[in-house]
């Protein structure tokens, strides 16, 4: 029988970012209690030698699985050291891969009482408005004018440590254009 290949989307991530992600997940699972129902699987609990860890996040009757890998082929850059992350949404026997932005929105939808979802309606009805959303990574668009006005009136409180964001885990901070320092008209800036 011939080999059968299965292709998965894996975002290349540096190992320090993966360590930070794991640390935040464990903190909110065991200390703050905000990640109730989440489960963390260590590398020795998996049959795949490339899997470093798995975080299972229940979303109703489905779940989101964030898998970190090690020992992958290195990328084209020196800092791509064979670490990676894949994000999968599973429900019964069906599974599909999702992008980090959608993963953050799903986590936000199931785990947080959000200011933007209910603030406008509550304020019109005269109810007390929750001043902020604890999971800002779940927001990726500009809100309505009403939302922006209410957001300007309330002061959001910062939560330390922040809740782990899948988008932040997979963002490409290495390939962002670098700003060169120098005086106006300098040779380094203009290239002349």
Swiss-Prot record:
Binding residue positions for Zn(2+): 108, 114, 133, 139
Region of interest (Membrane association), residue spans: 171-172
Region entry Interaction with host APOBEC3G, spans: 40-44
Modified residues (Phosphothreonine): 96, 155, 188
Functional note: Counteracts the innate antiviral activity of host APOBEC3F and APOBEC3G by promoting their ubiquitination and degradation. Acts as a substrate recognition component of an E3 ubiquitin-protein ligase complex: mechanistically, Vif hijacks a host cullin-5-RING E3 ubiquitin-protein ligase complex (ECS complex) and the transcription coactivator CBFB/CBF-beta to form an active E3 ubiquitin-protein ligase complex that targets APOBEC3G and APOBEC3F for polyubiquitination, leading to their degradation by the proteasome.
Sequence segments annotated as region (Disordered): 162-192
Domain comment quoted from the record: The BC-like-box motif mediates the interaction with elongin BC complex.
Record keywords: AIDS, Host cell membrane, Host cytoplasm, Host membrane, Host-virus interaction, Membrane, Metal-binding, Phosphoprotein, RNA-binding, Ubl conjugation, Ubl conjugation pathway, Virion, Zinc
Protein localization: Host cytoplasm; Host cell membrane; Virion
Residue span of region RNA-binding: 75-114
Residue window of motif HCCH motif: 108-139
Chief location of this protein within or outside the cell: host cell
Phosphoserine PTM sites in chain numbering: 144, 165
GO BP terms, alphabetized: viral life cycle
Protein name: Virion infectivity factor
Taxonomic placement: Viruses, Riboviria, Pararnavirae, Artverviricota, Revtraviricetes
Site (Cleavage in virion (by viral protease)): 150-151
Region described as SOCS box-like: 151-180
């Amino acid at each position: 029988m011939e080999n059968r290949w299965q292709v998965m989307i894996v975002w290349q991530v540096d190992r320090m970012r993966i360590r930070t992600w794991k640390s935040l997940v464990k903190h909110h699972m065991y200390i703050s209690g905000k990640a109730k129902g989440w489960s963390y699987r260590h590398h020795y609990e998996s049959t795949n030698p490339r899997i470093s860890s798995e975080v299972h996040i229940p979303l109703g009757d489905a779940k989101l699985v964030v898998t970190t890998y090690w020992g992958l082929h290195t990328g084209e850059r020196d800092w791509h050291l064979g670490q990676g992350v894949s994000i999968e949404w599973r429900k019964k026997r069906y599974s599909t891969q999702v992008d980090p932005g959608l993963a953050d929105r799903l986590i936000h939808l199931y785990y947080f009482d959000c200011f933007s979802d209910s603030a406008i309606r509550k304020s019109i009805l005269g109810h007390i408005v929750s001043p902020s959303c604890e999971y800002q990574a779940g927001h990726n668009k500009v809100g309505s004018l009403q939302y922006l006005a209410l957001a300007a009136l309330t002061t959001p409180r910062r939560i330390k440590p922040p809740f782990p964001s899948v988008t932040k885990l997979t963002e490409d901070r290495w390939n962002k254009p670098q700003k060169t320092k120098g005086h106006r008209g300098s040779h380094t800036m203009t290239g002349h």
